Amino acid sequence: MGAVSLAGKTLLERYRVVRPLGQGALATVYLAFDPFGAPYALKVFPKGAEARRDREFWVGKRLDHPNLNPVLEKLDLEEGPALLLAYAPGEEMGRWMAREPGRARALKVFRQLLLALAHMHEKGLVHRDVKPENILVAGTDEARLVDFDLSGPALEAFKKPLRVGTLPYLAPEQVLGQSPGPEADVYAAGVILYWILAGEHPFVGAPEEVLLGHLKEPVPPLPGLGERERSYLERLLAKRPEDRFRSAGEALEVFPF
Protein backbone atom coordinates (compact mmCIF):
# COMPACT_ATOMS: atom_id res chain seq x y z
CA MET A 1 0.00 0.00 0.00
CA GLY A 2 1.49 3.32 -1.05
CA ALA A 3 1.97 5.95 1.63
CA VAL A 4 -0.03 8.52 -0.40
CA SER A 5 -2.67 6.17 -1.83
CA LEU A 6 -5.52 7.59 0.28
CA ALA A 7 -4.51 11.26 0.44
CA GLY A 8 -7.31 13.47 -0.86
CA LYS A 9 -10.00 10.80 -0.54
CA THR A 10 -13.13 10.92 1.60
CA LEU A 11 -13.81 7.57 3.26
CA LEU A 12 -17.22 6.29 4.35
CA GLU A 13 -18.58 9.70 3.28
CA ARG A 14 -17.20 11.07 6.53
CA TYR A 15 -13.41 11.09 6.93
CA ARG A 16 -11.40 13.37 4.64
CA VAL A 17 -7.85 12.06 4.36
CA VAL A 18 -5.25 14.83 4.17
CA ARG A 19 -1.81 13.25 4.27
CA PRO A 20 0.13 10.28 5.62
CA LEU A 21 1.51 10.65 9.13
CA GLY A 22 3.72 7.61 8.96
CA GLN A 23 4.17 4.21 7.39
CA GLY A 24 5.43 1.05 9.02
CA ALA A 25 5.80 -2.55 7.99
CA LEU A 26 2.30 -3.39 9.21
CA ALA A 27 0.13 -0.37 8.39
CA THR A 28 -0.04 3.23 7.17
CA VAL A 29 -1.34 6.05 9.38
CA TYR A 30 -3.05 9.09 7.86
CA LEU A 31 -4.28 12.42 9.17
CA ALA A 32 -8.02 12.68 8.56
CA PHE A 33 -10.80 15.11 9.48
CA ASP A 34 -14.49 14.54 10.08
CA PRO A 35 -17.19 16.93 8.72
CA PHE A 36 -16.88 19.09 11.85
CA GLY A 37 -13.13 19.59 11.37
CA ALA A 38 -12.05 17.30 14.20
CA PRO A 39 -8.70 15.60 13.49
CA TYR A 40 -8.13 11.86 13.73
CA ALA A 41 -5.39 9.38 12.96
CA LEU A 42 -6.59 6.71 10.53
CA LYS A 43 -4.55 3.51 10.61
CA VAL A 44 -5.06 1.41 7.48
CA PHE A 45 -3.88 -2.20 7.31
CA PRO A 46 -3.31 -4.28 4.18
CA LYS A 47 -6.27 -6.22 2.83
CA GLY A 48 -6.66 -9.50 4.64
CA ALA A 49 -5.19 -8.19 7.91
CA GLU A 50 -8.50 -8.06 9.79
CA ALA A 51 -7.18 -10.32 12.55
CA ARG A 52 -4.24 -8.01 13.22
CA ARG A 53 -6.56 -4.98 13.19
CA ASP A 54 -9.01 -6.69 15.53
CA ARG A 55 -6.23 -7.62 17.93
CA GLU A 56 -5.00 -4.04 18.18
CA PHE A 57 -8.59 -2.85 18.66
CA TRP A 58 -9.07 -5.40 21.45
CA VAL A 59 -5.97 -4.12 23.24
CA GLY A 60 -6.75 -0.45 22.72
CA LYS A 61 -10.32 -0.64 24.02
CA ARG A 62 -9.04 -2.01 27.33
CA LEU A 63 -6.89 1.04 27.94
CA ASP A 64 -7.88 4.43 29.30
CA HIS A 65 -4.98 6.67 30.33
CA PRO A 66 -3.89 10.19 29.31
CA ASN A 67 -0.43 8.93 28.31
CA LEU A 68 -1.82 6.24 25.98
CA ASN A 69 -3.30 7.17 22.62
CA PRO A 70 -6.99 6.16 22.47
CA VAL A 71 -8.26 3.60 19.95
CA LEU A 72 -11.75 4.79 19.02
CA GLU A 73 -13.33 2.57 16.40
CA LYS A 74 -12.62 -0.15 13.86
CA LEU A 75 -13.59 0.49 10.25
CA ASP A 76 -13.94 -1.72 7.18
CA LEU A 77 -12.78 0.20 4.12
CA GLU A 78 -12.51 -0.86 0.49
CA GLU A 79 -8.79 -0.18 0.85
CA GLY A 80 -8.43 -2.54 3.82
CA PRO A 81 -9.30 -2.92 7.50
CA ALA A 82 -8.66 0.21 9.55
CA LEU A 83 -8.65 1.75 13.00
CA LEU A 84 -9.80 5.23 13.92
CA LEU A 85 -7.45 6.66 16.53
CA ALA A 86 -7.33 9.90 18.45
CA TYR A 87 -4.96 12.35 16.80
CA ALA A 88 -1.92 12.87 19.03
CA PRO A 89 -0.17 16.16 18.22
CA GLY A 90 3.57 16.31 18.59
CA GLU A 91 6.63 14.55 17.26
CA GLU A 92 8.48 11.31 17.84
CA MET A 93 10.68 11.41 20.92
CA GLY A 94 13.84 10.92 18.87
CA ARG A 95 13.22 14.09 16.86
CA TRP A 96 12.19 15.91 20.03
CA MET A 97 15.43 14.88 21.75
CA ALA A 98 17.45 16.05 18.74
CA ARG A 99 16.41 19.60 19.62
CA GLU A 100 18.16 19.19 22.99
CA PRO A 101 15.27 19.82 25.38
CA GLY A 102 17.49 19.16 28.40
CA ARG A 103 17.65 16.29 30.88
CA ALA A 104 14.89 17.56 33.20
CA ARG A 105 12.30 17.74 30.41
CA ALA A 106 13.39 14.39 28.98
CA LEU A 107 13.03 12.76 32.41
CA LYS A 108 9.54 14.25 32.66
CA VAL A 109 8.66 12.50 29.40
CA PHE A 110 10.24 9.28 30.66
CA ARG A 111 8.12 9.37 33.80
CA GLN A 112 5.02 9.66 31.60
CA LEU A 113 6.20 6.58 29.72
CA LEU A 114 6.32 4.68 33.02
CA LEU A 115 2.80 5.89 33.84
CA ALA A 116 1.52 4.63 30.48
CA LEU A 117 3.20 1.26 30.86
CA ALA A 118 2.03 0.94 34.46
CA HIS A 119 -1.56 1.24 33.25
CA MET A 120 -1.00 -1.43 30.60
CA HIS A 121 0.64 -3.77 33.10
CA GLU A 122 -2.21 -3.28 35.59
CA LYS A 123 -4.55 -4.43 32.82
CA GLY A 124 -2.45 -7.55 32.24
CA LEU A 125 -1.10 -6.24 28.92
CA VAL A 126 2.42 -5.83 27.54
CA HIS A 127 3.35 -3.29 24.84
CA ARG A 128 6.31 -5.30 23.43
CA ASP A 129 7.67 -2.49 21.23
CA VAL A 130 8.60 0.38 23.54
CA LYS A 131 10.91 2.76 21.66
CA PRO A 132 11.22 6.53 21.03
CA GLU A 133 9.44 6.19 17.67
CA ASN A 134 6.34 5.07 19.56
CA ILE A 135 6.41 7.98 22.02
CA LEU A 136 4.85 11.22 20.77
CA VAL A 137 5.77 14.42 22.62
CA ALA A 138 3.60 17.55 22.30
CA GLY A 139 4.78 21.14 22.63
CA THR A 140 3.65 21.11 26.27
CA ASP A 141 5.95 18.12 26.95
CA GLU A 142 2.93 15.87 27.33
CA ALA A 143 3.73 12.40 26.01
CA ARG A 144 1.65 9.56 24.61
CA LEU A 145 2.68 5.98 23.97
CA VAL A 146 1.24 4.79 20.66
CA ASP A 147 1.13 1.74 18.37
CA PHE A 148 -0.27 -1.43 19.91
CA ASP A 149 0.56 -3.57 16.86
CA LEU A 150 2.60 -6.04 18.90
CA SER A 151 0.80 -5.60 22.22
CA GLY A 152 -1.10 -8.36 23.96
CA PRO A 153 -1.61 -10.28 27.19
CA ALA A 154 1.43 -10.68 29.42
CA LEU A 155 3.39 -13.90 28.86
CA GLU A 156 1.10 -14.82 25.98
CA ALA A 157 2.29 -18.09 24.51
CA PHE A 158 3.20 -17.89 20.83
CA LYS A 159 2.58 -20.81 18.51
CA LYS A 160 6.25 -20.77 17.59
CA PRO A 161 9.33 -18.86 18.81
CA LEU A 162 8.95 -15.28 17.70
CA ARG A 163 11.28 -12.34 18.22
CA VAL A 164 9.03 -9.30 18.52
CA GLY A 165 10.20 -5.76 19.15
CA THR A 166 12.93 -3.47 17.85
CA LEU A 167 16.60 -4.45 18.08
CA PRO A 168 18.11 -1.73 20.34
CA TYR A 169 15.28 -2.17 22.88
CA LEU A 170 14.89 -5.96 22.97
CA ALA A 171 15.00 -7.59 26.38
CA PRO A 172 17.20 -10.70 26.55
CA GLU A 173 14.16 -12.97 26.71
CA GLN A 174 12.82 -11.36 23.52
CA VAL A 175 16.17 -11.97 21.82
CA LEU A 176 15.71 -15.65 22.68
CA GLY A 177 12.18 -15.69 21.24
CA GLN A 178 10.51 -16.22 24.61
CA SER A 179 7.08 -14.83 25.49
CA PRO A 180 7.63 -11.43 27.11
CA GLY A 181 6.00 -10.25 30.31
CA PRO A 182 5.93 -6.73 31.78
CA GLU A 183 9.63 -7.05 32.58
CA ALA A 184 10.39 -6.80 28.85
CA ASP A 185 8.74 -3.37 28.72
CA VAL A 186 10.70 -2.41 31.83
CA TYR A 187 13.94 -3.36 30.06
CA ALA A 188 13.06 -1.30 26.98
CA ALA A 189 12.25 1.65 29.24
CA GLY A 190 15.68 1.17 30.80
CA VAL A 191 17.32 1.45 27.39
CA ILE A 192 15.44 4.71 26.81
CA LEU A 193 16.51 6.04 30.22
CA TYR A 194 20.14 5.14 29.44
CA TRP A 195 19.81 6.96 26.10
CA ILE A 196 18.42 10.05 27.85
CA LEU A 197 21.32 10.09 30.30
CA ALA A 198 24.15 9.10 27.96
CA GLY A 199 23.02 10.26 24.52
CA GLU A 200 23.44 6.75 23.11
CA HIS A 201 22.19 3.21 23.60
CA PRO A 202 23.99 0.90 26.04
CA PHE A 203 24.76 -1.59 23.26
CA VAL A 204 25.78 -0.38 19.80
CA GLY A 205 27.39 -1.88 16.71
CA ALA A 206 26.36 -4.49 14.16
CA PRO A 207 23.08 -6.31 14.84
CA GLU A 208 24.92 -9.37 16.12
CA GLU A 209 26.89 -7.21 18.56
CA VAL A 210 23.74 -5.55 19.86
CA LEU A 211 22.03 -8.91 20.36
CA LEU A 212 25.08 -10.23 22.21
CA GLY A 213 25.13 -7.09 24.34
CA HIS A 214 21.53 -7.63 25.41
CA LEU A 215 22.25 -11.24 26.26
CA LYS A 216 25.67 -11.18 27.90
CA GLU A 217 27.47 -7.85 28.09
CA PRO A 218 27.38 -5.68 31.22
CA VAL A 219 25.75 -2.28 30.89
CA PRO A 220 28.48 0.35 30.33
CA PRO A 221 28.66 2.51 33.48
CA LEU A 222 27.64 6.15 33.34
CA PRO A 223 29.84 8.62 35.23
CA GLY A 224 28.18 11.16 37.48
CA LEU A 225 25.25 9.04 38.66
CA GLY A 226 24.56 8.71 42.36
CA GLU A 227 24.26 5.30 43.95
CA ARG A 228 20.44 5.31 43.89
CA GLU A 229 20.31 6.34 40.23
CA ARG A 230 22.97 3.81 39.21
CA SER A 231 21.27 0.97 41.08
CA TYR A 232 17.90 1.91 39.57
CA LEU A 233 19.25 1.87 36.01
CA GLU A 234 21.01 -1.45 36.57
CA ARG A 235 17.80 -3.01 37.83
CA LEU A 236 15.85 -1.80 34.80
CA LEU A 237 18.49 -3.38 32.55
CA ALA A 238 19.09 -6.62 34.46
CA LYS A 239 19.63 -9.62 32.17
CA ARG A 240 17.17 -11.88 34.00
CA PRO A 241 13.50 -10.80 34.09
CA GLU A 242 13.22 -11.84 37.74
CA ASP A 243 15.99 -9.37 38.65
CA ARG A 244 14.13 -6.40 37.15
CA PHE A 245 11.16 -4.48 38.47
CA ARG A 246 8.12 -6.70 37.97
CA SER A 247 6.16 -3.91 36.32
CA ALA A 248 6.42 -0.27 35.33
CA GLY A 249 4.27 0.59 38.33
CA GLU A 250 6.87 -0.91 40.64
CA ALA A 251 9.61 1.02 38.83
CA LEU A 252 7.58 4.21 39.15
CA GLU A 253 7.28 3.88 42.92
CA VAL A 254 11.04 4.27 43.43
CA PHE A 255 11.85 6.54 40.46
CA PRO A 256 14.94 8.41 41.75
CA PHE A 257 15.38 11.14 39.13
Language-model features, listed with the residues they occupy:
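Conserved C-terminal C-lobe helix
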Residues: 225-238
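Activation-segment/catalytic-loop signature of the eukaryotic protein kinase fold
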Residues: 74
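Conserved catalytic-loop aspartate of Hanks-type protein kinases
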Residues: 185
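Protein kinase catalytic-loop region centered on the HRD/HxD motif
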Residues: 115-125
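Activation segment signature within eukaryotic-like protein kinase domains
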Residues: 109-110
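Conserved short submotifs of the Hanks-type protein kinase catalytic core
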Residues: 78-92, 96
